[in-house]
Each structure stands twice: as structure tokens, then as C-alpha cells.
Amino acid sequence: MYYRYMIVAILLLLLGVLGIVLNRGHLIIMLMSIELILLAASFLFLINSMITDTLIEQVFTIMVLTVAAAESSIGLAIMVAYYRIKGTIAIKSLNWLRG
């Protein structure tokens, strides 16, 4: 019964991976693809929680969503600061961040 939801979650996960592979030059699209991967993984945890009738996957999902929100906000803040300094957020211009 839950296999349809699992197929949707796996397709979302693959869509996120495909977004990272195809858009290597755009940071915002890569960040959105990483968020999609994390949300698909948490959706899989929730489906597994419904199948096995345990709560540990739900707790883990809340932790994954918290880390995803923190990662997204920090990543966007770094991108905004970088855009203010350089005027672009293309990956080709990120070589000055090496330290």
C-alpha cells in the first residue's frame, strides 16, 4: 500500500540528484536540489515509520528538517554576501574562496 509513496519519494530523490548533475554552474539551483534530496529522504523516513509503526524515524525526520533549514539559511546568507562582493554567484568565480 505504501509502495506508491515510496516511488514518489525515490523519484523526488532522483530529481534532486539530476538537478545537481545537470546544473553544475548555478549555485541556487544546486542548493534547491540539495534541499529536495533532504526532503525526499525525510519523506522516506516517514513512510518507513508508518510501515514499521515506530517513532524513531519521525524524530529523525524532524532532525533532518532542522538541519536542512539551517543549511539552507546559511547557504543563502553566504551566497548573498558573495553576490554583494563579486556581483555574481556563478561557480566559475568561486576560486577566490580558497584559503
UniProtKB/Swiss-Prot annotation:
GO terms for cellular component: mitochondrial membrane; NADH dehydrogenase complex. Keywords: Electron transport, Membrane, Mitochondrion, NAD, Respiratory chain, Translocase, Transmembrane, Transmembrane helix, Transport, Ubiquinone. It is a multi-pass membrane protein. Signal peptide: none annotated. It holds the Pfam family Oxidored_q2. The chain crosses the membrane at residues 2-22, 27-47, 59-79. It is an enzyme of class 7 (translocase). Belongs to the complex I subunit 4L family. This is NADH-ubiquinone oxidoreductase chain 4L.
